[in-house]
Design a protein with these regions (language model features):
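Residues embedded in well-ordered beta-strands within globular domains across many folds
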Residues: 6, 146, 220, 295-296
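Radical SAM [4Fe-4S] cluster-binding motif and immediate context
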Residues: 13-260, 282
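Residue-level recognition of beta-strand->loop/alpha-helix junctions
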Residues: 81, 222, 265-267, 299
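A charged, well-structured terminal subsegment
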Residues: 1-10
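Flexible glycine/acidic-rich beta-alpha junction loops that bind and position SAM and/or redox cofactors
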Residues: 72, 105-112, 155-158, 229-234, ...
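Catalytic cores of alpha/beta
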Residues: 271-285
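C-terminal, active-site-flanking charged/polar segments
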Residues: 243-247, 282-288, 300-305, 318
Length: 326
């Protein structure tokens, strides 16, 4: 479930700018002195952005979060379970679910960490996101906005409207000069967020064109693996929401529209075979040659609170977690 969260951002912003938490301990009648700071010459070897005229650092990238958590339940991740587990009792946390009698694997939804979500995903509206963009543009004049939500929008009809409305606001802002036309936007998105599900599964080309017009440049896609079987194993747990065919449709579609998508790959998935390992390496290499960026991590690292971590901790899987410093 996704719910829009209406927060009076204008009031909050003005509060932080005019007073802020740092000012709460100050008496109202104390006159604040302006502190002059001498700035020396910039280090020519420093790679931080420096304004050559004022010797002051300037902001190139703004990082924003617009939602409470990710609705997906990937087996290695705890984003979806944080609110659930923070409200769970010790008895609920330690409960051992009953194994299926037919010899099948325990369904992930039977776990405390992956059960029904007591909290919907809250996100701020396109208008509120746009307002935050404008305020940061006015104050910092950045070059890039990075939306750091695990899933910036969801691939449902309301989710598509959410991102399309934001794109329209950004496009209009660039046309009127309210936003610098060269500003870029980056975000993380799931493969399924680019796919129209009904009546037939197809690439949402209209959305991709709208994203490009608005200035979206880079998408980090949580592919994890190109091996079809591994998409539904417990440590990955895509639960049949996406297929390898979907992955190829979206990645190739983004390439065809002039994007260079970033594909996140976990190289050593615990349940995989040698054949699947080589297959994933082969497909990833082919996409690299086409211009796709491959963000590859060698090991699957389960977060505490994730489904696979709970299975391991409760002895419900033959998999073991071995932690090392590297």
């Amino acid at each position: 479930e996704i719910k829009d969260l209406h927060i009076p951002y204008k009031d909050y912003w003005e509060y932080t700018q005019n007073e802020g938490a740092a000012a709460l301990n100050l008496e109202k009648n104390i006159k604040k002195e302006k502190i002059e700071v001498e700035l020396g010459e910039a280090d020519p070897h420093c790679d931080l952005p420096v304004n050559k005229d004022t010797q002051k650092f300037f902001v190139e990238t703004i990082r924003l979060y617009t939602s409470s958590h990710c609705p997906w339940k990937c087996g290695f991740c705890s984003s979806h379970s944080f609110l659930r587990m923070s409200n769970a009792t010790a008895e609920q946390e330690e409960k051992i679910p009953e194994m299926p009698k037919n010899g099948e694997k325990l369904p992930m939804n039977a776990l405390t960490s992956c059960g029904s979500q007591p909290h919907p995903v809250y996100r701020i509206s396109p208008e509120q996101i746009y307002d935050i963009i404008l305020r940061h543009c006015d104050k910092y004049d950045p070059k890039v906005f990075l939306f750091n939500d695990d899933a910036f929008w969801d691939g449902s009809t309301p989710g598509f409207k959410h991102i399309m409305d934001l794109c329209n606001l950004i496009i209009e802002g660039k046309k009127t000069g309210r936003i610098n036309k060269d500003i870029l936007f980056n975000c993380q998105a799931k493969v399924g967020d680019f796919i129209i599900k009904k009546p037939t599964r197809q690439l949402h080309s209209e959305l991709i064109k709208k994203l490009k017009e608005a200035g979206f440049y880079h998408f980090g896609t949580g592919v994890e693996t190109f091996a079809e079987r591994l998409l539904t194993v417990q440590s990955i747990n895509k639960k049949g929401n996406v297929s390898e065919k979907d992955q190829h449709m979206v990645i190739q579609g983004l390439l065809d529209h002039g994007f260079s998508p970033s594909v996140n790959i976990i190289l050593f998935v615990p349940e995989q075979t040698i054949e699947e390992l080589f297959y994933v390496m082969k497909v990833a290499t082919e996409y690299m040659l086409k211009g796709t960026q491959i963000a590859m991590t060698p090991l699957l690292r389960p977060q505490e609170g994730s489904g696979i971590y709970e299975l391991i901790r409760k002895g419900l899987t033959p998999l073991k977690a071995h932690y090392v410093e590297w």
